[in-house]
């Protein structure tokens, strides 16, 4: 087996910026940001726009999640 070809599998905090939900899990995602977790340790931070904490399918609530302004751009373009 070749040495040093496998990705670094480590503890990472995922932060759903839409619902302000954070979860500590393991991943190979690379990031430069870090955050101090509840246990006092510092972990790499990966920000995501949507997760099961904010997705309408999992929450049962229908709400529009638009983080890049696409809905406003569409409504302005096709407004009557």
Swiss-Prot record:
Task: Give GO terms for biological process.
Answer: translation
A GO term, aspect molecular function: structural constituent of ribosome
What UniProt keywords apply to this chain's record, in alphabetical order?
Answer: Ribonucleoprotein, Ribosomal protein
What GO cellular component term, any one, is given?
ribosome
rRNA-binding keyword on record: no
InterPro entries in UniProt: Ribosomal_bL28/bL31-like_sf (IPR034704), Ribosomal_bL31 (IPR002150), Ribosomal_bL31_B (IPR027493), Ribosomal_bL31_sf (IPR042105)
**Assembly with partners or alone:** Part of the 50S ribosomal subunit.
Q: Which PANTHER family match?
A: 50S RIBOSOMAL PROTEIN L31, CHLOROPLASTIC, LARGE RIBOSOMAL SUBUNIT PROTEIN BL31A
Q: Which protein family is named in the record?
A: Belongs to the bacterial ribosomal protein bL31 family. Type B subfamily.
Q: What is this protein called?
A: Large ribosomal subunit protein bL31B
Organism this protein belongs to: Stenotrophomonas maltophilia (strain K279a)
Q: Which gene encodes it?
A: rpmE2
């Amino acid at each position: 087996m070749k040495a040093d070809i496998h990705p670094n599998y480590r503890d990472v905090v995922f932060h759903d910026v839409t619902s302000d939900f954070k979860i500590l899990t393991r991943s190979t995602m690379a990031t430069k940001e870090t955050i101090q977790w509840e246990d006092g340790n510092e972990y790499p931070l990966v920000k995501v726009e949507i997760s099961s904490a904010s997705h309408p399918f999992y929450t049962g609530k229908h709400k529009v999640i638009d983080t890049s302004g696409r809905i406003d751009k569409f409504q302005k373009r096709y407004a009557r």
